């Protein structure tokens, strides 16, 4: 019994530590655990071919420079809010409730209306739920690279 308890305590500790290492952002008073897309391959793949995403999850795309960005929904099976942030983590553009697209390479782009460095994709409806307005600040948790 004592070994079992020791094992249980160790397993719980390890799972808590693993959860603490997951990158996160805060926006509008809500915390989202995010996957990071920091290179060209990860940014190109994005959330393609995913059937669902938990409500408290998202993907943060980190670009090398702040410039106009455009995203599309090719092979993306989840309707999304695409949120664009500048070097200072300020929301500069929003594409809300972006629908699925089955047109392959003919899927339309969803551009930023201003130069952006970071792009956060959340499940469609999150921006409305948070009542986001341009100028909202995105807070980074530990381990997310800052603009240089």
Located regions from the model:
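Bacterial N-terminal signal peptides
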Residues: 6-15
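Bacterial N-terminal signal peptides that target proteins for export
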Residues: 1-5
């Amino acid at each position: 019994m004592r070994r079992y308890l020791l094992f249980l305590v160790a397993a719980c500790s390890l799972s808590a530590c693993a959860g603490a290492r997951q990158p996160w952002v805060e926006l509008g008073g809500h915390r989202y655990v995010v996957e990071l897309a920091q290179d060209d391959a990860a940014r190109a793949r994005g959330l393609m071919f995913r059937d669902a995403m938990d409500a408290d999850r998202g993907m943060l795309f980190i670009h090398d420079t702040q410039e106009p960005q455009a995203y599309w929904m090719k092979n993306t099976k989840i309707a999304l809010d695409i949120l664009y942030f500048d070097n200072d983590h300020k929301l500069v553009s929003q594409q809300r409730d972006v629908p699925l697209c089955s047109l392959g390479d003919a899927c339309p782009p969803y551009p930023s209306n201003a130069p952006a460095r970071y792009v956060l994709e959340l499940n469609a409806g999150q921006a409305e739920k948070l009542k986001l307005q341009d100028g909202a600040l995105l807070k980074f948790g530990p381990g997310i690279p800052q603009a240089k």
